[in-house]
């Protein structure tokens, strides 16, 4: 920021930091773009359904109506959050199975680009938790589920139900509402994290995985896996545009 202030002072005789910051904000807003929207809008579906078989293909999950609907619900929730920030999506897709099965890798590759994925959200009561959400689309909660208690699960349930964060960045004078553009996935070795009450359970969408039944390991050919998942998103986008899935 110091170099920008010096540049504007030398070249434009602007010396007010407040005016320079306001000008930068205006120019940035006039030239903003959304890289995730751009990628999703560029996808062309080849017409082959993959959502139903996706989790079986990579992780050996059952190829069932339940698994298909849970993954579809997650994908459409993620798409809505990008195109309609703050859209209501209160659930977490939870992949349940042994270590080394590729659960975290699945979420990472599903985010399309690695920088749009994060597994760095460790504490929900951190004042700077918003920094862990900025710029990320799919956020995996693994350690929190692994060390869950009744209290922590209630905190997770409350956290994933929010539609916005309210905070002030270093160059802003007042806090602002930031509508959420991310969704949350979970991974666990067991189902022990699930609350016993039905109200708590409905926030978590568990899918059992059986890696020995998978058709391929997701890292066997990462390029092929990424191409497959792009077509999964393309299929989901076709559903989104059809308006037939609420």
List the model feature ranges, each with a label:
Residues 1-9:
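Non-catalytic nucleic-acid substrate-recognition regions in nucleic-acid-modifying enzymes
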Residues 107, 156-157:
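Short amphipathic alpha-helical segments and helix-helix/interface helices
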Residues 9-34, 88, 115-119, 125-152, ...:
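Feature primarily recognizes SF3-like P-loop helicase cores of small DNA viruses
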